[in-house]
C-alpha cells in the first residue's frame, strides 16, 4: 500500500484536436506556476552537493504537470515506506504532497511546467514555508535517503 496519492482530472469535453479538462482541487486557495526552462532541480543541491528538500507545515501541494515531465522525490518519516520517487506527466493527475513531507523535483533537458493548486491553512507564511532543508544537516532525512529503498512510481 502506498501513501502517495493523486487527484485525477476529469475530461468533460473533447473536440477535434482539443481536450477540455476539469482540474479543480476542492478547497484550493492558492495556485503556483513552477516553470523549469531546461534541466533543473528544485531546490538545488547545497554547497557541498547534498540534496535539499522543501517541507511545508501549513500547505498541502497538488502538483500537476502541464507540459513536459517532472520527477518528484518524497520523504515522509511517518509513512510505512518513507521514500518515494514519482515520475509525472500531463496524464498523471495532480500529485498530492501532504504537510510534513520532504519533497524536491527534477526536470529533464526539455524542462517542464507544473501548476501547484495548493491548500494553505491560516498559519501559512511564505517566508518560512520555502526554506530548503539539506540532507547534510538533517539526520533523519539523511538516514532515510541512505538506508531506505525508494518506491518507484511511473505513471
Predicted regions and their residues:
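Active-site region of the double-stranded beta-helix
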Residues: 1-90, 107-113, 118-155
Amino acid at each position: 500500500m502506498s501513501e502517495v496519492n493523486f487527484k485525477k482530472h476529469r475530461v468533460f469535453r473533447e473536440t477535434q484536436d482539443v481536450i477540455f479538462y476539469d482540474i479543480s482541487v476542492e478547497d484550493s486557495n492558492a495556485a503556483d506556476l513552477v516553470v523549469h526552462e531546461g534541466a533543473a532541480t528544485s531546490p538545488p543541491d547545497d554547497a557541498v552537493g547534498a540534496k535539499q528538500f522543501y517541507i511545508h507545515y501549513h500547505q498541502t501541494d497538488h502538483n500537476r504537470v502541464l507540459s513536459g515531465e517532472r520527477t518528484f522525490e518524497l520523504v515522509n518519516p511517518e509513512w510505512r515506506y518513507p521514500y518515494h520517487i514519482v515520475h509525472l506527466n500531463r496524464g498523471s493527475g495532480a500529485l498530492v504532497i501532504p504537510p510534513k513531507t520532504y519533497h524536491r523535483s527534477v526536470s529533464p533537458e526539455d524542462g517542464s511546467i507544473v501548476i501547484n493548486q495548493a491548500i494553505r491553512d491560516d498559519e501559512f507564511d511564505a517566508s518560512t514555508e520555502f526554506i530548503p532543508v539539506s540532507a547534510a544537516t538533517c539526520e533523519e532525512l539523511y538516514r532515510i535517503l541512505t538506508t531506505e529503498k525508494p518506491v518507484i512510481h511511473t505513471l
